[in-house]
């Protein structure tokens, strides 16, 4: 099988089979899988994503589209730095070696990529464009630097965006993330929050789960900002944001974030307060609050109620208010908010009901809308009316106003690492922050770097960061932070439209290809890459790089490939190939010691539950692997790797070769009967396989093609064979299977005597009239109970059906000589005779 696969891969390369033109009279179709990080080797878990995309690309080509199906490398990132430290070599060497190996692997799987458009994000010819783009953002005040609390990963020694913190830990290292106050570069994604939110409803071809995740991440809240004066220091106020300002008369405390500026100014930091602040610093994002027990510590400060100066409220540092949401301060209304209620019970704060409810708010918060009570001038109003009224009062008093807040925060793009795109800025003691002139781009990373594992090597480089200021020509230093790698992946799909363009994009080419018609990748990118790419597209539209404002028309999120995990007696992970099963138990192949089988999980390097691609290719071939990862479950669902599954796919491919030999040896028999049912099945399969592929029901399409192959095999085994229909059916089967298993189908197609390549052919056409059956079977009922069945010709009339069914012996038995009162027909399904 490997020889056949290598043969066709060579032919496709020589014939430039999958290179496409930007100038074609055909309609365009752009299918794209999320570009991989060049980690070293592709395992079978990766293959599923690429196989799905390849089926769609090949199918749409057969449907008459000019299909763009490119591939490239998301090549910056920390793993390369870790490898550099471990091997004492430059990350570039490790990265380019991995790219070479992985490209070879992808080609060996027969994927129909247009390699002439390949991009590599660590190539200066690529990242020079995003450096220029960053400077354009800076000129528009969409890029800025400020000091802020950031998520610091102490293992990777870098800052993480909120989206890169999962359950309080770094998404790559798994280390517990802490807060640090650092100067960072940000992009103003919040300027586009409203459009990003509103446009979600137009992404009709995206999974509802992803759209919902983005809506929640952007998190629009409508409410009010208003001020509380601090008791005994009334010139100073605390500004709060609330989505339920109408409950102001139920306030019993002010909650502030652990890093609220008022703490530095006015709060005496007791050991209790300092310990609590340290504890809070480990909470890095609002999603973690749901799992955190509500706690607080009193600051010693009180504020005055805005509508009743006799009421004072304690100011409490809480662990459920974050500085990066709203103003970093809230007023707590325990009777009508679950978090506030939990804290009030714990700290013995008052719980005052201000919305009518048939429940005891001392025990549980009532969080629904209703009629206001115990609320002075708001009494008797609905929650909505009271909200408008109280905001009006804030505005009259000059202490507040209506406002909108978003959970989404500006994107922190600074990373304290070497292997990333340098941020093209210079810091001058005289001139301040100075952009690198366009003519001096790209700012390229140095080759002579020392990786000792501590911090960012660019900070310690003896010469790279030292430059003269472009404004005053005095000594200055370069920015040593590099871009978050999501910067590169936020626009790469535009570069594919013309990867040789002298500017960031070839607008004409982008106008032809964009938006991407079908984007394929993991749902884990819903609120990182997919949101950033949407943001970039909007800004690049305004900079006249592209005409679209949304990058991806359709999105498909594939399921993961799973495999069992194994551990030895020392709790070390083992690779599947190191384990052998004896009976119902597992043992280490070399030591013969007992092995514990763990959970079935996503294939990952850390748990070693990977299946090596090259080993599987040697054993079964690329086509069998492709077929298996697509056939055992719907592509949006997880798939468990199984030896029996891949062996079954290998047998099916061998069966195709056997069928070819059997059919090739057949002689035409003019006396054989036409197998109308087989002919109907051929046309039925063409129609429904096309529909299945369009709807990404690839496993169902494979099942239909297996059914057709079984029907053809059954016909071959007969004494009298309808050779013409068998040959036609087998030709169709080979064509239908081509997007799934392209090597063996091209080989068989050639052996069938065909000159044209399958990749150049149109998808088979079906004849609708052939789908009609000559006969159909109807259920015959008497008084609603099944008494018989009867096969009718399609040409039969309703009167004939009634006459035949009434005269059936089994029906006559129940009629007992009576005439039917009524006969009800459900066409081609049921005859119900009423007596």
Curated annotation (Swiss-Prot):
GO terms for cellular component: cytoplasm. InterPro entries: aa-tRNA-synth_I_CS (IPR001412), aa-tRNA-synth_Ia (IPR002300), Leu-tRNA-ligase (IPR002302), Leu_tRNA-synth_edit (IPR025709), M/V/L/I-tRNA-synth_anticd-bd (IPR013155), Methionyl/Leucyl_tRNA_Synth (IPR015413), Rossmann-like_a/b/a_fold (IPR014729), tRNAsynth_Ia_anticodon-bd (IPR009080). One of its GO terms (molecular function) is aminoacyl-tRNA deacylase activity. The keyword Lyase does not apply. It is found in: Cytoplasm. Belongs to the class-I aminoacyl-tRNA synthetase family. This is Leucine--tRNA ligase. It catalyses: tRNA(Leu) + L-leucine + ATP = L-leucyl-tRNA(Leu) + AMP + diphosphate. Its EC number is 6.1.1.4. It is an enzyme of class 6 (ligase). ATP binds at residue 605. Signal peptide: none annotated. It comes from Rickettsia africae (strain ESF-5). Pfam families: Anticodon_1 (PF08264), tRNA-synt_1 (PF00133), tRNA-synt_1_2 (PF13603), tRNA-synt_1g (PF09334).
